[in-house]
């Protein structure tokens, strides 16, 4: 077995974050809201060439992170990887496997989760509230939330989605049963 040293720092303590980042290779952060606690952490990782991984489901934070830190991260070799949690990973890997099996892209895919255990963390609830407040306060944030390509490096390169929208209704599906929306689907469509 391999022993890994673990360093812990409060995200709102800039000096502690800086010290921690200077002494690590990979930083994993698992608590939001990232819009409150993540900017200086991503910035420090980008500056020091440290890889960064989070569970973020906040479109405004990720867009801001890309806009503010991509060039620096690219120059230092830091890999900034957002959205590595349940919100997106099963859909992302599922889409990759589906594409590899079919050998062609799809115009539309719906994912159904049969059984789900657990709950929503307080950090996720607070993150949702922060995103909602930001969207009400800033029309650009609201516009980005409704743009399925808001996190894409080239938003105009994606297919046109005229007439398509997220399906938020509860309905019966033949062979499946009753289905409803995944509460993170609006975010998930931006990263998968």
Locate predicted features.
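A short helix-to-beta-strand connector/capping loop
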Residues: 2-6, 76-78
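Conserved Rossmann-fold cofactor-binding substructure of NAD(P)-dependent oxidoreductases
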Residues: 5-26, 30-37
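Residue-level detector of anion-binding/catalytic polar loops
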Residues: 26, 51, 79
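ADP-ribose/adenylate-binding Rossmann-like module
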Residues: 29, 33, 42-63
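Rossmann-fold NAD(P)-binding glycine/threonine-rich loop
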Residues: 38, 56-78
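Gly/Ser/Thr-rich loops at beta-strand to alpha-helix junctions
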Residues: 59-61, 84-92, 116
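Rossmann-fold dehydrogenase core element
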Residues: 69-85, 105-109
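Active-site-lining helix/loop region of Rossmann-like oxidoreductase modules
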Residues: 100-192
């Amino acid at each position: 077995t391999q022993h890994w040293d673990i360093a812990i720092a409060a995200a709102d303590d800039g000096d502690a974050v800086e010290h921690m980042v200077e002494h690590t290779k990979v930083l994993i952060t698992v608590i939001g809201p990232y819009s409150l606690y993540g900017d200086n952490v991503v910035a420090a990782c980008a500056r020091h060439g440290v890889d960064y991984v989070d569970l973020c489901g906040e479109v405004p934070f990720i867009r801001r992170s890309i806009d503010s830190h991509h060039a620096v991260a690219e120059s230092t070799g830091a890999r900034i990887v957002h959205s590595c949690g349940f919100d997106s990973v099963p859909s992302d890997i599922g889409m990759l496997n589906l594409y590899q099996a079919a050998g062609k892209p799809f115009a539309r895919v719906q994912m159904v989760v049969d059984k789900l255990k657990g709950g929503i963390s307080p950090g996720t609830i607070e993150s949702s509230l922060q995103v909602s407040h930001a969207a009400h306060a800033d029309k650009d944030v609201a516009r980005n939330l409704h743009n399925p390509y808001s996190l894409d490096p080239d938003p105009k390169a994606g297919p046109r989605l005229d007439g398509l929208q997220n399906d938020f209704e509860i309905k019966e599906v033949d062979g499946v049963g009753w289905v409803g929306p995944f509460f993170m689907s609006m975010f998930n469509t931006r990263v998968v």
